[in-house]
Every structure is written in C-alpha cells, then in structure tokens.
UniProtKB/Swiss-Prot annotation:
<comment type="subunit">
    <text>Homodimer.</text>
</comment>
<dbReference type="InterPro" id="IPR015895">
    <property type="entry name" value="4pyrrol_synth_GluRdtase_N"/>
</dbReference>
<comment type="function">
    <text>Catalyzes the NADPH-dependent reduction of glutamyl-tRNA(Glu) to glutamate 1-semialdehyde (GSA).</text>
</comment>
<dbReference type="InterPro" id="IPR036343">
    <property type="entry name" value="GluRdtase_N_sf"/>
</dbReference>
<feature type="binding site">
    <location>
        <position position="121"/>
    </location>
    <ligand>
        <name>substrate</name>
    </ligand>
</feature>
<comment type="similarity">
    <text>Belongs to the glutamyl-tRNA reductase family.</text>
</comment>
<feature type="active site" description="Nucleophile">
    <location>
        <position position="51"/>
    </location>
</feature>
<feature type="site" description="Important for activity">
    <location>
        <position position="100"/>
    </location>
</feature>
<keyword id="KW-0560">Oxidoreductase</keyword>
<dbReference type="GO" id="GO:0006782">
    <property type="term" value="P:protoporphyrinogen IX biosynthetic process"/>
</dbReference>
<protein>
    <recommendedName>
        <fullName>Glutamyl-tRNA reductase</fullName>
        <ecNumber>1.2.1.70</ecNumber>
    </recommendedName>
</protein>
<feature type="binding site">
    <location>
        <position position="110"/>
    </location>
    <ligand>
        <name>substrate</name>
    </ligand>
</feature>
<dbReference type="InterPro" id="IPR036291">
    <property type="entry name" value="NAD(P)-bd_dom_sf"/>
</dbReference>
<comment type="pathway">
    <text>Porphyrin-containing compound metabolism; protoporphyrin-IX biosynthesis; 5-aminolevulinate from L-glutamyl-tRNA(Glu): step 1/2.</text>
</comment>
<dbReference type="Pfam" id="PF01488">
    <property type="entry name" value="Shikimate_DH"/>
</dbReference>
<keyword id="KW-0521">NADP</keyword>
<dbReference type="InterPro" id="IPR018214">
    <property type="entry name" value="GluRdtase_CS"/>
</dbReference>
Length: 435
C-alpha cells in the first residue's frame, strides 16, 4: 500500500484554475470520489477543497496509475487540458505525502500560517468520505496522526495564538485602507458559513455594524442573533439595495456562479472596498472607477508579513511535523511486520500438525504421547523462531532492511496484501480519529 496527494494550492495554481477544480457541493464531491475509488488501484480517497487548495488524498496500490487517474478525472471536471493540469499539479508520494498532510492540518502550508480553520476542514473532508464509503482505516490512521501532530504544534509553539484567517486579513486590509473611519460603518457580509461568520466577528471588533446576507432567512437570523445586536440579517433578494448603499462588502458563499454581477450596480460613483473570499469567485469582474476589489490571491502579499512574523515558530513547528512523519512510518513499518511473523508461526503450526498426524498414523508416536510430543515440538520451534522474529521487528523500521523482509516473505510464501492490519495496531494507536 502507498500514500499519495495530488495538490492544486495557492502555491502552484492560480485562482482561476482552482475555481474550475473546486467542489462547490457535496453531490459533485461524492460523484468524483466514487469514480476515483472505482479504480482497483485506489483503496481510499478524500478531497480537501477550500478557498486556498484542492487536494486529493489517497491510499493506493499504484501511485503512478492513481496520479494519472486523478488528472484525468480533474481535467474532465474542470474542462482543462490534461497536460496543462499535469504541469501544474504538485504530486506527493508516500513519506512526502504524509509530511504534507501533517503540515496542512497543522496550518503550516496555509496562505496565512497559523490560520485556524484548516484542521476542522480536513477532519470534515475525511468524515464526508468515510460516511460515503470512500475512506476508511488506511486514511483514518493518517488523519489520527495528523490531528495529534497539529495539537502538539499548537501546544509547543505560539503559531496559532490570535488565530488568523483569510477573513481577518481581509478586514485588516479594510481597516488599513479606511483607518479610524471604519468605526461606525456598515459592513455587508454575503454568506453565513464559517468564513462569513469570521468576517462578521472581525468587523464587529473594529467597530462596524454588520448586515449578514444569505439565502435562508431563518438560518441567517439564527447566526446573526448569536453574534449580537449589531448584526442584522437579510436575504439575497435585497442584496442590490446594500451594494449600492454601502462601500464595505465581504463575500464568501458556496455558489458555483458569481452572486454579485455588473447588472446589479446602480450607483457607480459610490467608493467601494470589496473582498471576495470565495472559490469559485462570488464577484464578477467589472470596471468601476471607484471599486477596490481584493480576491483570494490578492491577499497573499498582504499575508506575507504574517509569514515573516511567525517564521521562527514555523521552523519549530516543521521540526515537529518531521518527527511525527518519522514516527508514523516507523509505526507503520513495525505494524506491517506483524502479519509476516504471524504467518511464519501459522506455517510452523501447520507443519507440526501435519507431521504429528503422519507420525500417529505411521505408529511412530504412541497416542498417549501425542500431547507431550506436540508441546515439545511447539517449544522447539518457538525457541528456533525467537531470534529471527525479534530481529525482524527490530529491522522493520529501517528502510535499508525492506529487501530483507521481502525475502523472508518470499522464503515462507507469505502474502500480506489482503491482511486486515487493524488487528495488529498497538494499544497506543487504537483510538485514532473517530469519524
């Protein structure tokens, strides 16, 4: 079994391409996962689809085939050229894949280092796949380690103190542009999901009143009530009124198409500071003289200061990620040797049984001596196998001994391809991440 991640993130993929590759709804995500895991060489998979990344996380039988299967499905989904997609994609295999997912969950690979949302987003991505039958024990143990790693990063560094998100960067930029004048202004937030709620909270902190807009008034009203009396709820039907009256707008819906289009603009002379925090984009490209429009990728330069401030802590955090990656693979390799040892002992038991039956049938061993002879044979073989099994366990964590272990499997005709490794987990790791 192998691990692989195919990544299209803010580091290697422009926003316009990420928009085409994004999964705006659960139905599209479920269909893609069903198609991908339908290939015999893909054991399990889940999708991380956020404003900053689209990544396919897999446990595979063949990384080469899995990689090209992902590219093929993604090119069909996004209407993109296969080879263009291949030249853009970042591929992580095995230990690189494990280190990458640990970094992602620990918020070290984010556009804003230390942002607080990604851990929950990855957990939810796995939970979705688990519930749809496309992810299970193989990726569960990866996520279990990733969550533990993220917890240690948070506890051992201050990288996540005063949690930062794209929403906070956007509000900070608005504050920078408007200065103290922002106090008392009305900020329009389109979308009542996690990002919209974060934007509303940050606007309240800088002294703004907030209008929270969504499609379902009851849901939006519930969210608005939880944020306090300075937040008003309204529906998308009244969006035109707000964008032509107030200058500050933050949009983060899950709509597959822009919700703010040029035909909604009535007052072209109104100064506007708009922040599009959605993938795909919520705000259509438009030419307005007094419009300052910031999209996801525009916030990258703004967040560079945040990277610089946290660089020292990020070094410490990356050391933790490297250690957890080594520990995970050491555990995985140690785990993989147990079925080999068990089958060696099963072969011995079968040989003892076969020879005992032959000896009894031929009269070499009287029936009354059978129990003692069987016990003696078992003790002899246990003593004979003791040193080899101990050495196998010790060498299982060393990559240079992989060929040795494979040779043992070949010598004893041992097949571990279809073994359920779950029964061999040591006690420290049995709980894992609960889907």
């Amino acid at each position: 079994m192998y691990y692989q991640i195919v990544s299209f993130s803010h580091k290697n993929c422009e926003q316009s391409m990420r928009e085409k590759l994004a999964f705006p709804n659960d139905e599209e995500k479920a269909t893609f996962l069903e198609q991908l895991t339908g290939f015999e060489f893909v054991h399990e998979a889940f999708i991380i689809s956020t404003c900053n990344r689209v990544e396919i996380v897999m446990a595979t039988r063949d990384n080469f085939s899995s990689y090209h299967a992902v590219l093929g499905l993604m090119s069909q989904k996004g209407g993109l050229n296969f080879y263009e997609l291949k030249s853009t994609a970042k591929r992580y295999d095995d230990e690189e894949a494990i280190e990458h997912i640990f970094s992602v969950v620990s918020s070290l690979d984010s556009l804003v280092i230390g942002e607080s949302q990604i851990t929950g987003q990855v957990k939810e991505a796995f939970r979705f796949s688990f519930q749809h039958g496309t992810a299970g024990r193989r990726l569960n143990r990866v996520l279990s380690y990733a969550v533990k790693c993220a917890a240690e990063v948070r506890n051992a560094t201050n990288i996540s103190q005063n949690p930062i998100s794209i929403a906070s960067v956007a509000v900070a930029q608005a504050h920078k542009l408007l200065g103290d004048n922002i106090q008392g202004m009305k900020g329009i937030v389109v979308g009542a999901g996690d990002m919209g709620v974060l934007a509303a909270k940050h606007l309240l902190r800088v002294g703004c009143d907030v209008v929270l807009i969504g499609r379902d008034l009851d849901k939006v009203q519930t969210v608005a009530d939880s944020l306090g009396e300075d937040v008003k709820a309204d529906t998308m039907e009244n969006l035109t009124k707000y964008i032509n009256r107030y200058r500050l707008l933050f949009s983060a819906t899950s709509s597959p198409e822009p919700v703010i289009t040029g035909d909604l603009i009535e007052n072209e002379t109104l100064p506007r500071q708009w922040f599009d925090m959605a993938i795909p984009r919520d705000i259509e490209d438009m030419e307005l003289e007094k419009l300052q429009l910031f999209r996801i990728d525009d916030l990258r330069a703004i967040s560079n200061d945040n990277h610089a401030m946290r660089e020292e802590q990020a070094v410490r955090a990356n050391e933790i990620v490297e250690r957890y990656t080594e520990e995970f693979y050491a555990w995985l390799k140690a785990l993989s040797i147990e079925p080999v040892i068990k089958q060696m002992r099963q072969h011995v038991s079968a040989a003892i049984e076969k020879e005992m039956q032959r000896a009894l049938k031929k009269g070499f061993v009287p029936k009354e001596y059978e129990s003692n002879m069987r016990k003696m044979a078992e003790q002899m073989f246990n003593r004979f196998l003791h040193d080899p099994t101990q050495n196998l366990r010790a060498s299982s964590t060393e990559s240079k001994n992989t060929n040795c272990i494979e040779s043992v499997k070949k010598m004893f005709n041992i097949d571990t391809e279809h073994v359920d490794f779950k029964q061999y987990k040591n006690d420290h790791h049995t709980k894992g991440y609960s889907a």
